[in-house]
Amino acid sequence: LKQVIDMGIPPIVILPGLRDIVQHASIISGYDDNEKTIFHYVPEQKPSEEGIQVGVIPEKRFEKLWSEDGCLMVLLGPTDIISSLKPDENKTKSNRLCFESERLSIQKQTEETINSLKKAVELNPNNSTALCLLGGVLNEQNNPDCVSYYEKSLEKNKNCYLAYRGLGNFYLKNQQFDKSEKNYTHAIEINDNRFGPIYKNRGYVRQQQSKMDQAKEDYQNYIKFTPNAKDRGMIERALNEM
């Protein structure tokens, strides 16, 4: 990352989201080796002429957050500069296929998405992102094969939040509430404020297991981390009845 910055190319990295956004892209503008910090552009909370501001993240915190999504980085720059970095061709192609597969998924081209991700895994069997995305596509079809792909993703990257969340969602759909709770909990242990709706899901599976106090706490956290949730009123009424 620092090598790229030193070459004058501001990399775009994939980082965890907040509230009801599970992921976001951020431009890294620099670093400070003395202070051990990373500089990145973040959107202004209030409209302004520039619309962006520079944020500072402690280096260790940044590394932890970046690792949750496989340390993905997008580089935009002159071909001669990019090629001088001498990236692993198979890894680069594998990561590119991951981005292309997400586009195919949005276009509802499921078969093409699966083929693209399988090719990504063939090119780089250690690509935790490709394995997790493939698990996600199969999960949408309620295909139990998704479990093995999520588990392989976690073997490659123990901090893969989305793999644990995906397992939690799969087991919830199949009413295996104890397994669902376990995986949601693992995700929350990795990052407790990345995605507010995960608390609603864990609250539901705990409620189904008659863990009412824990369920209530999860619903409260859902409102805390997702204050603008469309179903906030319904959740608050449910809390009053619990």
What does each of the following model-derived ranges do?
Residues 1-40:
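Active-site-adjacent substructure of cysteine-protease-like catalytic cores
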Residues 31-129:
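Noncatalytic regulatory segments and standalone regulatory/sensor domains
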